[in-house]
């Protein structure tokens, strides 16, 4: 698994699993809202009244509408509202 996805996948999976409403801001400033229906290495399926396939390279920020629990690959729960990567190996 790529280093960048060690945070990305658990974060997006928790959003999907808990059906947390999100605002996704694109690099061009457009704001999309909905729930993460599915995702892979390159895209996120965002569901609102319709499903939209959003390419990850076009995303600037993903903002959850409420706090939720994220389980990292170490199986330690993190609070998403204060989620930090202090255990990131690149800092060592």
Curated annotation (Swiss-Prot):
Keywords: RNA-binding, Stress response. Homohexamer. Residues 9-68 form the Sm domain. It comes from the Bacteria. InterPro entries: Hfq, LSM_dom_sf, Sm. Residues 69-81 have a biased composition (Polar residues). It comes from Shewanella loihica (strain ATCC BAA-1088 / PV-4). This is RNA-binding protein Hfq. One of its GO terms (cellular component) is cytosol. Belongs to the Hfq family. Residues 68-92 are annotated as: Disordered. GO terms for molecular function: RNA binding. Disulfide bonds: none annotated. RNA chaperone that binds small regulatory RNA (sRNAs) and mRNAs to facilitate mRNA translational regulation in response to envelope stress, environmental stress and changes in metabolite concentrations. Also binds with high specificity to tRNAs. The lineage of its organism: Bacteria, Pseudomonadati, Pseudomonadota, Gammaproteobacteria, Alteromonadales. GO terms for biological process: regulation of DNA-templated transcription; regulation of RNA stability; regulation of translation, ncRNA-mediated.
């Amino acid at each position: 698994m790529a280093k960048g996805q060690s945070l990305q996948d658990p974060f997006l999976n928790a959003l999907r699993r808990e059906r947390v409403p999100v605002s996704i801001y694109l690099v061009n400033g457009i704001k999309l809202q909905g729930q993460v229906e599915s995702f892979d290495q390159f895209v996120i399926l965002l569901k609102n009244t319709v499903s939209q396939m959003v390419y990850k390279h076009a995303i600037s920020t993903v903002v959850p509408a409420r706090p939720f629990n994220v389980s990292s690959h170490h199986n330690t729960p993190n609070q998403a509202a204060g989620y930090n990567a202090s255990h990131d190996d690149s800092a060592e």
